[in-house]
Amino acid sequence: MSKELSSKYNPAEVEAGRYQKWLDADVFKPSGDQKAKPYSIVIPPPNVTGKLHLGHAWDTTLQDIIIRQKRMQGFDTLWLPGMDHAGIATQAKVEERLRGEGISRYDLGRESFLTKVWEWKDEYATTIKEQWGKMGLSVDYSRERFTLDEGLSKAVRKVFVDLYKKGWIYRGEFIINWDPAARTALSDIEVIHKDVEGAFYHMNYMLEDGSRALEVATTRPETMFGDVAIAVNPEDPRYKDLIGKNVILPIANKLIPIVGDEHADPEFGTGVVKITPAHDPNDFLVGQRHNLPQVNIMNDDGTMNELVFEFSGMDRFEARKAVVAKLEEIGALVKIEKRVHSVGHSERTGVVVEPRLSTQWFVKMDQLAKNAIANQDTEDKVEFYPPRFNDTFLQWMENVHDWVISRQLWWGHQIPAWYNADGEMYVGEEAPEGDGWTQDEDVLDTWFSSALWPFSTMGWPEVDSEDFKRYFPTSTLVTGYDIIFFWVSRMIFQSLEFTGRQPFQNVLIHGLIRDEQGRKMSKSLGNGIDPMDVIEKYGADALRWFLSNGSAPGQDVRFSYEKMDASWNFINKIWNISRYILMNNGGLTLDVAHDNVTKVATGEAGNVTDRWILHNLNETIAKVTENFDKFEFGVAGHILYNFIWEEFANWYVELTKEVLYSDNEDDKVITRSVLLYTLDKILRLLHSIMPFVTEEIFGQYAEGSIVTAAYPTVNPAFEDLAAHTGVESLKDLIRAVRNARAEVNVAPSKPITILVKTSDSDLEAFFNSNVNYIKRFTNPEHLEIASTIPAPELAMSSVITGAEIFLPLVDLLNVEEELARLEKELAKWQKELDMVGKKLSNERFVANAKPEVVQKEKDKQADYQAKYDVTVARIDEMKKLVK
């Protein structure tokens, strides 16, 4: 057992060294109990690009809540940790660091550069694990994985080769998304589309015979040197007679044909479209239909190549300006039409993505997607929480395109394909025998290896691996809705293809962490929050409590320090009531407390308030467990908060003082037993959310660790509806008296007369038998409980279920003075309402002020109106008394 709880809750003291003690005790490893049902989670591997953010903290907190609860419930739990090499993101970070040193990856060469990246990985992997420790994550480090581990690399190679042999991986030349900064291909979902201010540049392409010009509009005039044709719709009467003729490409002064193709929309623009097959996906298809050449006019870094005359070597956007100026100079520019249009940007580097003709590796998605869709119609389907994300998943799968999986990077899984001087290609899990073979320099998309994470981490392709047999498929995946397609869908179709089973039974989807104003956290806004800073100020338990209670599954959560203050205050409340209970414990052990509580349940000992709290504890255990099973942690947290703060601390603990301050030692032992027993169950219910503070308090009265303590279950013997109903009526009576005092501004310290009238003989008997509690909480000078009590003429009255309560006001209150005070208060609220109403009726203020400022004024207005209405009601009550 630990030392006595300190007088003040200090999270830094509570959490210091605790995580290492858990690790030393091996409490996070699977139990190994073959009779226990396995429950496994694989952590969504964070990128080794830097420190974890609040989103990671949220994601991992939810997983830890699940795994800690299941561990306490007796499951054989495995939470497998690991990290992702994050190809393009990590390489970009390392290249940025090298640029600061004045060198590039090309200066170093591939091997030396990769050495630098591994050094980066080791540095940030250490940082991430330190942060996991600060968060209290109960992962099994003995099974830690990395996506470039040899075991995982073996799985990647096998999957690639198997899909290639089935014809589902192929190599081809297509238009892909190209990141000129990273110099690599991107998949469609790695491209973020943003509305930007741009322009349509209208220019004339003169017919070969000079008889007329055709006006063409484009947003990318710099690509005109790659034009190999212009297209018109074959049904467009304006141009169909021109099909087969030639036009002169401005500046280049070369002839290109006019083709008829339905890609040209007569209703859009001029109805004439420039065709640049090497730089536009639609033009690429037109080019294939008409057997047109493909002319690439751009280097891989976004500069113009040698085919563009004096513009060669220019950055694409500088070239755009120069080309437009040249068009204007030669009289080919018709007009520039400003407009906002959607432009693709690289998710990783932020630069504008360039459509580019390139030879890449692709995964053919047709059958893989069909398999994933079909699985959702079976009994073994993946359950999404909330269910609406099943539709999101199916929508992605039904509209999926072939997946470009090759990346022009050095950091990652190098594609297992080799070429020789004879133009032969070999694809295999190992290098081909003999000399003269060169491996493909490209690496695989990071998501290709991540898609295998649930089963490759368990030892696959070694299907006889103990972990694979025991813990796969995994039980639950926790992740954000922003990567359902990036990751979740790919894990599902790869797992179905290679293991014949879904990768997980459940997918819990959470939202995004936003700032107090509802904005997404980003570097550009400067509103990001470092979870380690929050932990330093409030402690990990407070952050975890906030994150678990912030929202429902699938919903975003808004971070605020006000909410963090509330979280800390709640833990401080738990600390204080625990300290009170343990200081008044009298050396009681948990075993003795358990025996005494059994006597309370059977009616051998204790009083009605003891039976009431045990009944409510039972209900709390049932509701919390039910909501945990549905991943409704916010609902479970609300139930716990209400039980702990309201029912246990504010009522039961206060009610027990009647016994603890008495001279009856037998009653004291029973009360102490119920207090300790209930506290113990509360701590066990809370442990998965607040691991540090619950362990600290648990250690004051119990041996071992709460990590492996049994989770509370419902005890049918505690069900006592009569006790529950009776004490709730008692609470209603006490609340009614307190509220009446407040309404007429009578201090709690001033003794008053309380009359309780009830025609319910059982209730009358109950109140009379528990009159000591009523007196303790209401401070009566005179208390009468009876079935026949005439209503006093000048009195406040309240009605509760089964009874009416009167507070005579004679000699207690000067009604005239109270009316005057209330009238003055009413005038104050009216003045505040007038001021805020004037501001909100000002159209200029509403239009120009920040939305959060306007909302703040609206909140003020609602608050003042509520206070005004309450004051009016009190005035009406006072006026009735005067009559």
Curated annotation (Swiss-Prot):
It is an enzyme of class 6 (ligase). GO terms for molecular function: aminoacyl-tRNA deacylase activity; ATP binding; valine-tRNA ligase activity. Catalyzes the attachment of valine to tRNA(Val). As ValRS can inadvertently accommodate and process structurally similar amino acids such as threonine, to avoid such errors, it has a 'posttransfer' editing activity that hydrolyzes mischarged Thr-tRNA(Val) in a tRNA-dependent manner. InterPro entries: aa-tRNA-synth_I_CS, aa-tRNA-synth_Ia, Anticodon_Ia_Val, M/V/L/I-tRNA-synth_anticd-bd, Rossmann-like_a/b/a_fold, tRNA-bd_arm, tRNAsynth_Ia_anticodon-bd, Val-tRNA_synth_C_sf. Its main location: cytoplasm. This is Valine--tRNA ligase. ATP binds at residue 523. It catalyses: tRNA(Val) + L-valine + ATP = L-valyl-tRNA(Val) + AMP + diphosphate. It is found in: Cytoplasm. Residues 809-844 form a coiled coil. GO terms for biological process: valyl-tRNA aminoacylation. A motif ('KMSKS' region) lies at residues 520-524. Pfam families: Anticodon_1, tRNA-synt_1, Val_tRNA-synt_C. One of its GO terms (cellular component) is cytosol. Belongs to the class-I aminoacyl-tRNA synthetase family. ValS type 1 subfamily. The lineage of its organism: Bacteria, Bacillati, Bacillota, Bacilli, Lactobacillales. It comes from the Bacteria. Keywords: Aminoacyl-tRNA synthetase, ATP-binding, Coiled coil, Cytoplasm, Ligase, Nucleotide-binding, Protein biosynthesis. ValRS has two distinct active sites: one for aminoacylation and one for editing. The misactivated threonine is translocated from the active site to the editing site.
